[in-house]
Amino acid sequence: MILYPSVDDLLERVDSRYSLIMLASKRAHQLDEGQPELLDKYTSQKNVGKALEEVVAGDVIIDPNEKDL
């Protein structure tokens, strides 16, 4: 169960749960591939949790021009 960031906080950053899952999944894959972390400190040790923390911080957003999401 995810306690931080809360689902309510995350949904303030994206328009739907589907978009949130797709965004977090894509960012987690980027972290798996060695992309640099965007925050100085994370609560989570797992890449999916780190991706969600980046979303709630506003560092990861949906690009409306990208077709993969």
UniProtKB/Swiss-Prot annotation:
GO terms for biological process: DNA-templated transcription. Its EC number is 2.7.7.6. Keywords: DNA-directed RNA polymerase, Nucleotidyltransferase, Transcription, Transferase. SUPFAM superfamilies: RPB6/omega subunit-like. It catalyses: RNA(n) + a ribonucleoside 5'-triphosphate = RNA(n+1) + diphosphate. One of its GO terms (cellular component) is DNA-directed RNA polymerase complex. Pfam families: RNA_pol_Rpb6. It comes from the Bacteria. Signal peptide: none annotated. InterPro entries: DNA-dir_RNA_pol_omega (IPR003716), Pol_omega/Rpo6/RPB6 (IPR006110), RPB6/omega-like_sf (IPR036161). GO terms for molecular function: DNA binding; DNA-directed RNA polymerase activity. SMART domains: RNA_pol_Rpb6. Promotes RNA polymerase assembly. Latches the N- and C-terminal regions of the beta' subunit thereby facilitating its interaction with the beta and alpha subunits. NCBIfam families: rpoZ (TIGR00690). The RNAP catalytic core consists of 2 alpha, 1 beta, 1 beta' and 1 omega subunit. When a sigma factor is associated with the core the holoenzyme is formed, which can initiate transcription. Belongs to the RNA polymerase subunit omega family. This is DNA-directed RNA polymerase subunit omega. The gene is rpoZ.
